[in-house]
């Protein structure tokens, strides 16, 4: 495994997982709001 690839991939993966986490949390809030 090339270390440069890890250095490039790590922040991209962190950013992608953070974005998905935020989208998922917002989606859950919207669903809970619709249920009430």
Swiss-Prot record:
Keywords: Chloroplast, Membrane, Photosynthesis, Photosystem II, Plastid, Thylakoid, Transmembrane, Transmembrane helix. Signal peptide: none annotated. NCBIfam families: PRK13240.1. GO terms for molecular function: manganese ion binding. The lineage of its organism: Eukaryota, Sar, Stramenopiles, Ochrophyta, Bacillariophyta. GO terms for biological process: photosynthesis. One of its GO terms (cellular component) is photosystem II. Disulfide bonds: none annotated. It is a single-pass membrane protein. Residues 1-4 are lumenal. This is Photosystem II reaction center protein Y. Belongs to the PsbY family. It is found in: Plastid, Chloroplast thylakoid membrane. The chain crosses the membrane at residues 5-23. Loosely associated component of the core of photosystem II (PSII), it is not always seen in crystals. PSII is a light-driven water plastoquinone oxidoreductase, using light energy to abstract electrons from H(2)O, generating a proton gradient subsequently used for ATP formation. It comes from the Eukaryota. InterPro entries: PSII_PsbY. Residues 24-36 are stromal. It holds the Pfam family PsbY.
